[in-house]
């Protein structure tokens, strides 16, 4: 187990075959993976606003992202409602090439667990909603 102040930046996975694997549910044993994932996101903050655990080779449903300037960690996130479909383009740190066309929802309601594995519900809108949809897609093996 690492010390609290120790930062662990993990190598990124770029293989689309691996990234297309669905992730398994996360549990309390994945909290350290979430910390590594956040450290890795912060190390790439100039070019990345969100990451899923499969991007560092861990196939568990763990997501970290920048939500309007505050980093959030979500375990087992799932979208339970959405509205306001729109077309956009997104890039991905794990995929080579430029932005790709995709569709997202302006507003999403997400059920997830926090680090204590307590179930939470939260509504996200705008860019945070877009980021989170991208990362949840990663958990489900969906690539843009």
Predicted regions and their residues:
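Positively charged
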Residues: 1-144
């Amino acid at each position: 187990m690492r010390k609290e102040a120790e930062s662990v930046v993990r190598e990124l996975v770029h293989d689309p075959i691996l990234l297309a694997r669905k992730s398994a549910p996360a549990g309390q044993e994945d909290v350290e993976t979430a910390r590594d994932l956040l450290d890795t996101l912060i190390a790439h903050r100039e070019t990345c606003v969100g990451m899923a655990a499969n991007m560092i080779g861990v196939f568990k449903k763990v997501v970290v992202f920048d939500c309007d300037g505050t980093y959030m960690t979500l375990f087992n996130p799932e979208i339970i409602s959405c509205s306001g479909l729109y077309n956009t383009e997104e890039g991905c740190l794990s995929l080579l090439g430029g932005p790709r066309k995709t569709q997202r929802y302006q507003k999403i309601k997400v059920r997830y667990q926090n680090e204590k594995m307590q179930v939470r519900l939260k509504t996200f809108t705008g860019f945070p909603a877009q980021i989170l949809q991208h990362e949840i897609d990663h958990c489900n093996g969906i690539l843009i």
